[in-house]
């Protein structure tokens, strides 16, 4: 029988951005595989928090907007903090969706939540 929230230990899993692949399709496949392992833990009663990096992904978003801005004249460049938020959003969405799909398939009634962080640029004068 699936465990209810709070019955087991709590763990934090840190996924580096490089662990998520180099293309959107590769990332989706790796996220689905990772979700299975996370749900294994949840099924064993573990409360899981997942933290992830986004270095390669934010770089790809930033480069794509820079390329579009340079080549079509209509697309503005994306500021780096906003590109970071975009990458956090889509990585969080893919992770949550994959985890929720696996939880549902196993009959485990748990939910997910995503938190987008903000990049602060401090200038010392």
Predicted regions and their residues:
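N-terminal glycine-/serine-/threonine-rich phosphate-binding loop
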Residues: 1-51, 56, 60-67, 79
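Short, glycine/charge-rich beta-strand/loop segments that flank catalytic centers
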Residues: 109-121
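A structural motif corresponding to the C-terminal end of an alpha-helix
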Residues: 41-47, 94-110
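Generic structural hydrophobic/aromatic packing signal, biased to beta-strands
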Residues: 13, 95, 112-114
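Conserved small/polar residues in nucleotide/adenosyl-binding loops
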Residues: 123-125
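Generic hydrophobic/packing signal
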Residues: 58, 62, 99, 103, ...
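A glycine-rich helix N-cap at a beta->alpha junction
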Residues: 72-90, 96-97, 101
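General structural feature for long, well-ordered alpha-helical segments within catalytic domains
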Residues: 30-37, 87, 91, 95
């Amino acid at each position: 029988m699936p465990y209810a929230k709070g019955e087991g230990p709590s763990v934090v899993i840190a996924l580096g951005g490089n662990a998520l692949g180099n293309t959107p399709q590769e990332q989706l496949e790796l996220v689905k595989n990772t979700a299975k392992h996370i749900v294994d833990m949840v099924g064993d009663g573990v409360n899981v928090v997942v933290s992830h990096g986004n270095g390669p992904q934010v770089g790809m978003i930033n480069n794509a907007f820079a390329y579009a801005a340079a080549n079509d004249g209509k697309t503005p460049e994306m500021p780096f903090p906003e590109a970071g938020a975009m990458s956090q959003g889509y990585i969080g969405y893919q992770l949550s969706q994959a985890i929720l799909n696996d939880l549902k398939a196993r009959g485990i009634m748990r939910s997910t939540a995503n938190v987008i962080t903000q990049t602060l640029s401090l200038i010392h004068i």
